[in-house]
Regions:
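Structural motif corresponding to the C-terminal cap of alpha-helices
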Residues: 116-124, 149, 190, 368, ...
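Small/polar-residue-rich segments within soluble enzyme cores
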Residues: 1-98, 425
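Solvent-exposed, polar/charged alpha-helical surfaces in well-ordered, non-transmembrane soluble domains
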Residues: 5, 13, 17, 21, ...
Length: 476
């Protein structure tokens, strides 16, 4: 037999007050707590939400359910008379094993990121978009936003597609942003040099019966120009100088194929075909960012390697936990041998040598300067390093790449020589223009410029507009 049943939950307080005096004996009201999200849709996909019993259902609420909700607290009581129970004499009053989490998110940066990714998607007449802002040196995630979003307070009014934190759950083919990985791997292996020129085959190159094309036809390009002009043909030629297994090792070292371990819920590892299965077409395509699935956060972590002179910095979202006594904790070891929680920055890992990272960073700076594909990412008074990306979307129904759907992106960091923030902007299926330099770069510019002002990094006199030749000492 059940001694208790709910008749209705979360009723309006005014209605409860009106009914209170009219209810028969045995029927009453119970006050319940519920999670309220004062910023409404801001950070909705990241935070997630709780259900009617305060259980985490999505996002960080789900990821850290056991910490945020705590364990049920038991009380030792004795019965006094027929109904009343009181705690036993001397029963210790212990706080429940419940924690709060201090996130790395800066609410000011989150607000402007939400605003500009929404504007970018609307102006590009696109399906959706994602933007991530990360502290370059520590890996702290300062903002993560996807548009369209949803209000966690009213989650039942939205479809499940709105709940996805596409910064970590959605895979996409990165396109030309991936070329920085290809160039750095080939430079590290000594297979190319800064003073080389590459034959662009007048805009069309055939590999294994597959035609690779450049947007603009070129005869020859220097190594800097390969990235600045974003040549697919030259990137394919450079990538194919690497053996598949060596290339695959570099790709994995940059974090692709494994979860970023940021603390965000539902991280996807992406998808990389094993090197032993690569055809010549696979090898060439991966060299310019097609045929590999990555998450936006994975791509940002890889870009950030060049902001850190060759070191990979693990992203993180939780600065520390706070217990019921107000103590800050960087680690929690639950009893019973369950998985430990560790918060805050982690130790960085060297991926490539500083000389290689510095050289590729100079190439990335040229991308945002006069004649580069991301002139719209440049910010007056700040030097910007970055790379555009425009990739086709594979259509499983057709069994080939779509001719109408694209992903446009731009990822980079600023100030280029002393990076404070690394940012990636991704626009899915833009209809106004399909190029990352046109639709994603301006969103990056606005987010980066305003973030610099928030962080009190003020503009300096403008840098020279272009740099076609770079000399690098072997001893640097």
């Amino acid at each position: 037999k059940r001694s208790f049943v709910w008749l209705k939950r979360r009723i309006d307080p005014e209605l409860a007050k009106a009914l209170e005096k009219q209810l028969p004996k045995g029927i009453g009201f119970v006050d319940e707590f519920r999670r309220y999200y004062p910023q409404r849709s801001e950070g909705g996909q990241m935070l997630g939400f709780t259900g009617i019993d305060s259980q985490g259902l999505e996002g960080l609420e789900y990821q850290y359910e056991s910490l945020l909700k705590g364990k049920p607290q038991g009380y030792i009581v004795e019965k006094e008379g027929t109904y009343r129970t009181v705690p036993l004499k001397g029963y210790p009053e212990r706080p429940p094993e419940q924690f709060s989490l201090q996130l790395t998110i800066d609410s000011r940066i989150q607000h402007l990121t939400e605003k500009h990714i929404a504007q970018g998607v609307i102006e590009a007449q696109a399906d959706r978009g994602t933007a991530i802002v990360m502290d370059s040196s520590s890996g702290a995630i300062l903002a993560v936003a996807s548009y369209p979003g949803f209000d966690p307070n009213r989650y039942r009014q939205f479809s499940r597609a709105h709940f996805l934190n596409r910064a970590v759950t959605s895979g996409y083919e990165p396109g030309s942003t991936f070329k920085i990985i290809t160039l750095s791997a080939a430079l590290s292996e000594g297979l190319i040099s800064v003073d080389q020129n590459f034959d662009c085959e007048n805009g069309e190159y055939k590999v294994g019966g597959h035609r690779i094309r450049d947007v603009k036809k070129h005869q020859q390009l220097s190594l800097l120009q390969v990235l600045k002009k974003s040549s697919n043909i030259c990137a394919a030629k450079i990538g194919m100088r690497l053996s598949p297994h060596v290339f695959q090792d570099y790709i994995k070292n940059f974090g692709f194929g494994s979860r970023p371990d940021s603390g965000l819920a539902a991280e996807a590892p992406g998808k990389l075909l094993p090197a032993k299965k690569w055809t010549a077409v696979d090898h060439a395509s991966i060299s310019f960012g097609q045929g590999i699935l990555v998450s936006p956060l994975q791509m940002l972590v890889a870009i950030n390697v060049f902001a850190n002179r060759g070191k990979l910095v693990t992203p993180f979202t939780v600065q520390h936990a706070i217990d019921a006594s107000g103590n800050s904790l960087n680690q929690i070891d639950p009893p019973g041998g369950s998985e430990s929680y560790r918060f805050g920055p982690k130790e960085s890992k060297r991926i490539i040598e500083p000389q290689v990272a510095d050289l590729v960073r100079e190439f990335m700076i040229s991308v945002t300067q006069e004649g580069g594909t991301a002139r719209r990412a440049s910010i007056e008074g700040y030097q910007v390093a970055g790379k555009t990306g425009t990739s086709q979307v594979y259509d499983p129904k057709l069994g080939r790449y779509s001719k109408t759907q694209y992903v446009a992106s731009f990822g980079g960091f600023t100030p280029a020589k002393d990076p404070r923030v690394s940012i990636l902007v991704l626009i899915r299926n833009p209809r106004k223009s399909l190029y990352g330099g046109v639709v994603a770069a301006p969103v990056f510019r606005e987010i980066a410029r305003k973030t610099m002002l928030i962080q009190k990094v003020f503009p300096e006199p403008s840098q020279p507009n272009d740099q076609e030749s770079i000399r690098v000492s072997r001893n640097d």
